[in-house]
From Swiss-Prot:
GN (gene name): MT-CYB
Cofactor (UniProt): heme b
Protein's name according to its UniProt entry: Cytochrome b
Keywords on record: Electron transport, Heme, Iron, Membrane, Metal-binding, Mitochondrion, Mitochondrion inner membrane, Respiratory chain, Transmembrane, Transmembrane helix, Transport, Ubiquinone
A GO cellular component annotation in the UniProt record: respiratory chain complex III
Subcellular location: Mitochondrion inner membrane
Originating organism: Dolichotis patagonum (Patagonian mara)
Lineage: Eukaryota, Metazoa, Chordata, Craniata, Vertebrata
InterPro entries to which the protein is assigned, alphabetical: Cyt_b/b6_C (IPR005798), Cyt_b/b6_C_sf (IPR036150), Cyt_b/b6_N (IPR005797), Cytb/b6-like_sf (IPR027387), Cytochrome_b (IPR030689), Cytochrome_b_C_euk/bac (IPR048260), Cytochrome_b_N_euk/bac (IPR048259), Di-haem_cyt_TM (IPR016174)
Note accompanying the cofactor annotation: Binds 2 heme b groups non-covalently.
Self-association state and partner proteins as the record states: The cytochrome bc1 complex contains 11 subunits: 3 respiratory subunits (MT-CYB, CYC1 and UQCRFS1), 2 core proteins (UQCRC1 and UQCRC2) and 6 low-molecular weight proteins (UQCRH/QCR6, UQCRB/QCR7, UQCRQ/QCR8, UQCR10/QCR9, UQCR11/QCR10 and a cleavage product of UQCRFS1). This cytochrome bc1 complex then forms a dimer.
One biological process term in Gene Ontology: mitochondrial electron transport, ubiquinol to cytochrome c
């Protein structure tokens, strides 16, 4: 008799995706991040749902409703900090997942890679709108500054900003619609994840060697489910340590002050996971140029499949490309640091140099290094 997981029309889909899925036998811990991101997304949706039960999307009561959640709701403080720090954990895993994709040449799966970029934009939009909801000083002013960037769009910019605000400034209408979008987007993200999955399972997973692994596959369960559980335990240990010992470590103290449109914070900045893009935005003196650079800093990922000139897919046996990737990583850390600093000398200059280096490394140097490695292979 056929096993139910192989015959039942619904369970059969799950079986082919998570149990009997043929997986390369040599994939490392770097392939854990997909499952960890899925768990993180589930955690964010559940905690967010419980927070939404107590939160009020009104400029007068939003700040006090968050205080009420932390003080009066059973384990409200835990739910709130799990949600806030869960977002940070989500982005850490997301950046590692993208980094692994670049290192091992997973971007050659074009459909999977492009859906991944779309997912990144959706997650960034969700996180930005979530940051506005507590209605602290940084929430309100962050929303004002970032939405105001759209006014740089020729002809329709100002109208578009006022349309998003629902008035002539960030106010109750803005907060209400941001809450509506922040609530609905996390239910659209799993749909995009399913498409991401679908395209990945069309081609099969990549592996550290970058070679075709059709001749050497093993079932996903139990080998990689055990490995994923190990990754989950490490992730939960890190997240719970952050939540229970230093819940405000990654937050901004200004957000514990209720929003006041008459008092500007000394330094407006987004959450830490957007600082690299914010630094690129600030490094260009022109408003429209800054907005374009901000969008391109993420959209440049879509060019990776076209920029790949190497005869090898993975960077495992390409030491020069490895050095270049680690230089790019260091550059991103510098941009993140600069994004959190005030707009003054020498931070402006460092930010501009790091921004130029970011695009120059990806668009030009990586191609030259790949061609050089191809030459070396012929010797």
């Amino acid at each position: 008799m056929t096993h139910m997981r192989k015959s039942h029309p619904l369970i059969k889909i799950i079986n082919h995706s998570f149990i009997d899925l043929p997986t390369p036998s040599n994939i490392s811990a770097w392939w854990n991040f997909g499952s960890l991101l899925g768990i993180c997304l589930g955690l964010q949706i559940i905690t967010g749902l419980f927070l939404a039960m107590h939160y009020t999307a009104d400029t007068i009561t939003a700040f006090s409703s968050v205080t009420h959640i932390c003080r009066d709701v059973n384990y409200g403080w835990l739910i709130r900090y799990l949600h806030a720090n869960g977002a940070s954990m989500f982005f850490i895993l997301l950046y590692l997942h993208i980094g692994r994709g670049i290192y091992y040449g997973s971007y050659t799966f074009m459909e999977t890679w492009n859906i991944g970029i779309l997912l990144l934009f959706a997650v960034m939009a969700t996180a930005f709108m979530g940051y506005v909801l507590p209605w602290g000083q940084m929430s309100s002013w962050g929303a004002t500054v970032i939405t105001n960037l759209l006014s740089a769009i020729p002809y329709i910019g100002t109208t578009l900003v006022e349309w998003i605000w629902g008035g002539f400034s960030v106010d109750k209408a803005t907060l209400t619609r941001f809450f509506a979008f922040h609530f609905i987007l996390p239910f659209i993200i799993p749909a995009l994840v399913m498409i991401h999955f679908f395209f990945l399972h069309e081609t099969g997973s990549n592996n550290p060697s970058g070679l075709n692994s059709d001749s050497d596959k093993i079932p996903f369960h139990p080998y990689y489910t055990i490995k994923d559980i190990m990754g989950l335990l490490i992730m939960m240990l890190a997240l719970m340590s952050l939540v229970l010992f230093s819940p405000d470590l990654l937050g901004d103290p200004d957000n514990y002050t209720p929003a006041n449109p008459l008092n500007t914070p000394p330094h407006i900045k987004p959450e830490w996971y957007f600082l690299f893009a914010y630094a690129i935005l600030r490094s260009i003196p022109n408003k429209l140029g800054g907005v374009l650079a901000l969008v391109l800093s993420i959209l440049v990922l879509a060019l990776f499949p076209m920029l790949h000139l190497s005869k090898q897919r993975s960077m495992t046996f390409r030491p020069f490309s490895q050095c270049l990737l680690w230089m790019l990583t260091a550059n991103l850390f510098i941009l993140t640091w600069i994004g959190g600093q005030p707009v003054e000398y020498p931070y402006i200059t460092i930010g501009q140099l790091a921004s130029i280096n970011y695009f120059f490394t990806i668009l030009i140097v990586s191609r030259l290094v790949s061609l050089m490695e191809n030459k070396v292979l012929k010797w």
